[in-house]
């Protein structure tokens, strides 16, 4: 398999996670405690960033940026089976690097534990909707 699509998946996933996490950090800092404003700012930044990344990397790798997307497309026969494992490894590595980049940009510890509880049926329903919806 050529290296270019693998690099596109790693870089695209890293930039996507840096955008999602970075805009979330910035929105929380600037929103003055207004969660609705913070979520709106994060959603707009994420949507714009995702559009740009798909436009840039779509022609190179298909712009999966998510292991579930890769597995779904592979299972449906829309992506070659030989691409699945390299793409997933690239996506996981890119995701970690993207979060680290966001933390670096905002002078936060590279590794830190979340102070927010992220559990329960609502969280799982949101994740399922975002992933499979």
Q: Each predicted region: which residue ranges?
A:
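Membrane-interface helix-loop junctions and terminal tails of multi-pass membrane proteins
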Residues: 1-133
């Amino acid at each position: 398999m050529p290296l270019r699509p693998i690099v596109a998946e790693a870089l695209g996933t890293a930039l996507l996670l840096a955008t999602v996490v970075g805009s979330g950090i910035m929105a929380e800092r600037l929103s003055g405690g207004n969660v609705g404003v913070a979520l709106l700012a994060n959603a707009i930044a994420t949507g714009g960033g995702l559009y740009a990344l798909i436009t840039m990397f779509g022609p190179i790798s298909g712009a999966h940026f998510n292991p579930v997307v890769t597995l779904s497309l592979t299972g449906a026969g829309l992506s070659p089976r030989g691409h699945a494992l390299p793409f997933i490894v690239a996506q996981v590595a890119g995701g970690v690097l993207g979060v680290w980049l966001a933390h670096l940009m905002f002078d936060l510890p590279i590794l830190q534990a979340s102070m927010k509880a992220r559990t329960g049926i609502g969280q799982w329903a949101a994740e399922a909707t975002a992933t499979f919806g």
